[in-house]
Amino acid sequence: MSIFDYDPNFQSLMIRMLENAIEHSFHEIMITKAEPGYPVVYVNKAFSQFTGYSSEEIVGKSPAILQGPKTEPALLDRLNQALSEGRLFHGEAINYRKDGSEFVMEWKIVPIKNDKEVTSHYLALQRDVTK
């Protein structure tokens, strides 16, 4: 049993707290659907400020919009393999801002499962590790 089982009002409060934590995080956060192309459904303010893409510009698009000439295909293969197996992925990649400038990003991508334990979305936690 969890606290949600004892206090239904706490669930609503917890959702609001988590929404605020995500929106005001210093790290870039993206949520995508678990379907071909992994369309983006949410990015936080830190993501928009860092990449230059507003939420309106990126929601519905593939995260591949951030990739470019120096993004390693082998890394993307490992990423896709992990996602297809429903596993957490952790790695670093060279990606690109809207203005074309490159950055090195550390990623952690976590599958989000629905009530039937089927992956419905992915949570991508990102941070700039450019040296």
Give the role of each language-model region.
Residues 47-58:
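PAS/PAS-like sensory domain cap-loop motif
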Residues 59-70:
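PAS-family sensory/regulatory domains
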